[in-house]
Curated annotation (Swiss-Prot):
Acts as a component of the outer kinetochore KNL1 complex that serves as a docking point for spindle assembly checkpoint components and mediates microtubule-kinetochore interactions. Kinetochores, consisting of a centromere-associated inner segment and a microtubule-contacting outer segment, play a crucial role in chromosome segregation by mediating the physical connection between centromeric DNA and spindle microtubules. The gene is ZWINT. Component of the KNL1 complex composed of KNL1 and ZWINT. Part of the ten-subunit outer kinetochore KMN network that includes the KNL1, MIS12 and NDC80 complexes; a bioriented kinetochore contains approximately 150 copies of the network. Interacts with the MIS12 complex subunits MIS12 DSN1, and PMF1. Interacts with the NDC80 complex subunit NDC80 during mitosis. Interacts with ZW10. Interacts with CETN3. Residues 85-211 form a coiled coil. It comes from the Eukaryota. This is Outer kinetochore KNL1 complex subunit ZWINT. Residues 244-255 have a biased composition (Low complexity). It comes from Bos taurus (Bovine). One of its GO terms (biological process) is cell division. Residues 230-286 are annotated as: Disordered.
Amino acid sequence: MGAAESEVETAAREVLAKVADILEPVGFQEEAELPAQILAEFVMDSRKKDKLLCSQLQVVDFLQNFLVQEGTAQDQNPLASEDTSRQKALEAKEQWKELKATYQEHVEVITNSLTEALPKVEEAQIKQAQLQEALKQLQAKKQMAMEKLRIAQKQWQLEQEKHLQNLAEASSEVRERQTGAQQELQRLYQELGTLKQQAGQEKDKLQRHQTFLQLLYTLQGKQLFNEAEAEIPQELDLPKDKLQQVTQPQEQNTQDTMGREADNPQPVGDAGLPWLPGRQQHKEES
């Protein structure tokens, strides 16, 4: 029985060693780096292996307990027959063979699964590396595009600020010119009003002088008109051409008046006064 027990322990150790060898290539870091689909398949395979290992450990535990119980029963009952012990040993050996065959089948299934999974894992790792490289290139392109966009936005902003500054300067210059033009126009209007006022005053003054000259000429005759004519440039300070225009009608009127005086001489007693037609009519009536 000791040999059988040592054989069972040796077989259990071998099973544990094989399971450890099968599970050793895959670690937590590799699991974390695998894609979700491959990782799910690997987890399912791992669960199958864990179940198989648990069932094998249960069998080993059952065999150990069985051997312990057999040893205890033999110690308590030393009179048990040797045939019964051999029969039980043969049954245990048969069970062990069945368990070993089942274990081999499961090991083959697991090995085949791993053989099929390893190429997929390698392919997934290659795809992962390609995706990482593509992601790096995409990030680099994105960074370059963002940099170009930032430079373009900054340049556009500077151009807009410069354009707005030029517009502000042009608007200020236009406003200054408009203000100056309005002030100049207002000044010209004021000067025009002043000139119109002065022209009106000069016109009134000229009319008064003309009336005064006509009255003097009518009252005192040509000699007084000549004296008044000599005083006109001093009082009016008019140009010669305007003075000639003013005096020519007066001279014509003087000649006409002298002709009428020659035709109608004044009385002797009234030599100091100018002759008036109304006065002559008054004498005739008296």
